[in-house]
Amino acid sequence: MEFIPTQTFYNRRYQPRPWTPRPTIQVIRPRPRPQRQAGQLAQLISAVNKLTMRAVPQQKPRKNRKNKKQKQKQQAPQNNTNQKKQPPKKKPAQKKKKPGRRERMCMKIENDCIFEVKHEGKVTGYACLVGDKVMKPAHVKGTIDNADLAKLAFKRSSKYDLECAQIPVHMKSDASKFTHEKPEGYYNWHHGAVQYSGGRFTIPTGAGKPGDSGRPIFDNKGRVVAIVLGGANEGARTALSVVTWNKDIVTKITPEGAEEWSLAIPVMCLLANTTFPCSQPPCIPCCYEKEPEETLRMLEDNVMRPGYYQLLQASLTCSPHRQRRSTKDNFNVYKATRPYLAHCPDCGEGHSCHSPVALERIRNEATDGTLKIQVSLQIGIGTDDSHDWTKLRYMDNHIPADAGRAGLFVRTSAPCTITGTMGHFILARCPKGETLTVGFTDSRKISHSCTHPFHHDPPVIGREKFHSRPQHGKELPCSTYVQSNAATAEEIEVHMPPDTPDRTLLSQQSGNVKITVNSQTVRYKCNCGGSNEGLITTDKVINNCKVDQCHAAVTNHKKWQYNSPLVPRNAELGDRKGKIHIPFPLANVTCMVPKARNPTVTYGKNQVIMLLYPDHPTLLSYRSMGEEPNYQEEWVTHKKEVVLTVPTEGLEVTWGNNEPYKYWPQLSANGTAHGHPHEIILYYYELYPTMTVVVVSVASFILLSMVGMAVGMCMCARRRCITPYELTPGATVPFLLSLICCIRTAKAATYQEAAVYLWNEQQPLFWLQALIPLAALIVLCNCLRLLPCCCKTLAFLSRNEHRCPHCERVRTRNSDPEHGGSTV
């Protein structure tokens, strides 16, 4: 909330008028008309006085256009006779366009509420008084051009790119109001109208420029709506980067490609205790082509300054006119450098040497397997310092020589593919190997090479070992060296090369020593009775001396060379050095990788059978989705059948670069949860055996206990009911009581007596007694028929507590465990 101003005061200029009651309507009587003739006479007298008292303006004589045309025709033949042509007349300077209504309104408000921010006397931006706060863009360097505001302690917010502080009390009347209401339409700022639409502020391209950072945007009531930070060119219009307010919330609107609009502060460099803008070096030395050695000295003196690369670019571009940018500009820095000879451990014949193609550094940080190799020769530059893609230059003794780029090669265990070259750097894709060799063939068909021990094993992108990028597949994040020769943040150090001894420059001629320079600068020193040394560019003869008494070395301080640890330094120059940018930056990109063919899947009991068809070595991995993943993986190179067990928690299988496959077991059992009691017990027993046995046992115990109690109570009641009748001799029990208590109403005869009685009295009933065994047989058969059902119901008592091996089935449906599927 510190960056939200509050309106604790009111500005007089933009306050609405106070409300007043409407005046009552009064009837005004018409005035009496004056006499018409008197009024006309007074008007006539005043008009005559004006005409007589006003001075008559002097009329300029009217020019005769015809005479003017005739004079021009007469002068035309006279001008043709003159041999010298008159220079064309300069066009009169166009008058500055007057500011419009919106500009005038903003300027009137800005006179009090904005202040310039200056750095070393130059305006870099503005600070604005809004509400009760002073707001200034954080990227604008300098101090506010006001003694009171410059003393304030500002709070900085990098999120909103803003700095703010409380306004001094005596300046609150100069501040502007602010508002968070922003209906779509047109607003005002210093350069005219600002359109607000779709949550963006836009202006016509060219209306804003660097130096406008911090200017406010006003609505038609003079309230601040936003503060400008920068802009992004979008063709006909420019989108503004602003800080605004949305109901007590600070919001920063930054369009894509927005640039800060603070005025650029020139970076200063040093030359002979004199400072100058790095982008505008002084005339001596001002150009590398005119004063190469002095220019390199100036660059070495400013190598640690922030504007070094501006000075380098300005020194190498001698033309004062603006030049069109091209790819050749990136090679321009190499005209101040040269290739060199460096030590190589293996020059191709099993011995070391000073090779023109020595390996300095091999980088393999890219995850796509690309190598970035730095060598001592330079590719893409000719010996005349011109850019040529088809050439490379190398150091042949002391002189750079040209060779064709087509003869350049890189190899490990097999030849590599060169994907990019520039300067000292080569990009290559190489197969697996233990050594790296770089070489070339010169114009004399002589091969030069250098071999270094280097273990190279290209990393695998994704989960498949493919050999070439597919046209279709899957994109995975990776890193590579971008094939761009533009300047990057990486840099290498360069220095003046040391003097190179060369004994071939000395020759003996009848007691004298002749030094042949061969168009070079040679430093010599001879000890022939006295000290004889110097620096020469032409041939020289040393009298009365021998070759063994002289030393000659080629010196060249007009070019830099790479600061290699394999080359000795120039002891006279100490630690003086320069810097140049290098190409091919490492960047995060996406790589296209293939996707393996989907496997053929067969579902079984608690398992999945997968038939795999790899086109190249493909990784198969699987894990459990429980607490213990038990991760397993293997590379599959040929057709293979894999059987995987599906645990209860689920199984995740990943084949190649495809999305993971997920499987879950489907629980099922015999019986049904909504059937007969024995089916219900069987269903739950197979799913939850322990709990089912406990529940059935407790229920059976309770049921048997209740049945036993009921039988006991019935027996007690029966005994109480029949006891009185048993104690009474010859008592007759009532029929209802005998029916309930299952007792005879009276003492009955024995079976023999009853049978005699039936035989004598009711013979049909006597013979019906023979059907009793038949009825018993029928009842027994029915009981035997229902016995299997009873046994199946009670079978759970003899089963183990583990689940049925057939109770689990596997199902899958779009890797969704909640989605239903048919049991397999």
UniProtKB/Swiss-Prot annotation:
It catalyses: Autocatalytic release of the core protein from the N-terminus of the togavirus structural polyprotein by hydrolysis of a -Trp-|-Ser- bond. Keywords: Capsid protein, Cleavage on pair of basic residues, Disulfide bond, Fusion of virus membrane with host endosomal membrane, Fusion of virus membrane with host membrane, Glycoprotein, Host cell membrane, Host cytoplasm, Host membrane, Host nucleus, Host-virus interaction, Hydrolase, Lipoprotein, Membrane, Palmitate, Protease, Serine protease, T=4 icosahedral capsid protein, Transmembrane, Transmembrane helix, Viral attachment to host cell, Viral penetration into host cytoplasm, Virion, Virus entry into host cell. A lipid is attached at C721, C741, C742 (S-palmitoyl cysteine). Residues 84-114 are annotated as: Binding to the viral RNA. A motif (Nuclear localization signal) lies at residues 61-99. Its EC number is 3.4.21.90. It comes from the Viruses. GO terms for molecular function: serine-type endopeptidase activity; structural molecule activity. Residues 1-104 are annotated as: Disordered. Signal peptide: none annotated. Residues 91-100, 99-113 are annotated as: Ribosome-binding. The chain crosses the membrane at residues 693-713, 764-784. The record marks W261, S262, R325, S326, A748, A749, R809, V810 as: Cleavage. Residues 262-274 are annotated as: Functions as an uncleaved signal peptide for the precursor of protein E3/E2. Residues 113-261 form the Peptidase S3 domain. GO terms for biological process: fusion of virus membrane with host endosome membrane; proteolysis; symbiont entry into host cell; symbiont-mediated suppression of host toll-like receptor signaling pathway; viral translational frameshifting; virion attachment to host cell. Residues 262-692, 749-763 are extracellular. Residues 183-193, 219-223 are annotated as: Dimerization of the capsid protein. The keyword Transmembrane applies. A motif (Nuclear export signal) lies at residues 144-154. Residues 721-741 are annotated as: Transient transmembrane before p62-6K protein processing. Residues 36-68 are annotated as: Host transcription inhibition. Glycans are attached at N273, N588, N670. Belongs to the alphavirus frameshifted structural polyprotein family. This is Frameshifted structural polyprotein.
